[in-house]
């Protein structure tokens, strides 16, 4: 099976693959060249996931702006 480009994966698939890549890298069992390839793939997956999150946030903002009664507040990932 061909490896999909990160931007063509769903958010969930990208995060799942990223988790797998991180686990493989953390194991320390990969030869250096393989580890570098996995690291590169992981960076691509993380960037694609972040882009999908940004797009989702923008869609939510647009939907909230369309509702005249809704108060729009900036998204802050650090709010707990």
From Swiss-Prot:
Signal sequence, renumbered to the chain: none
Entry-linked InterPro entries: Exonuc_VII_S (IPR003761), Exonuc_VII_ssu_sf (IPR037004)
Keywords: Cytoplasm, Exonuclease, Hydrolase, Nuclease
Location, primary (coarse class): cytoplasm
GO annotation (BP), single: DNA catabolic process
Catalysed reaction, written as an equation: Exonucleolytic cleavage in either 5'- to 3'- or 3'- to 5'-direction to yield nucleoside 5'-phosphates
GO molecular function, one term: exodeoxyribonuclease VII activity
Assembly and binders: Heterooligomer composed of large and small subunits.
Sequence similarity: Belongs to the XseB family.
Name under which the protein is recorded: Exodeoxyribonuclease 7 small subunit
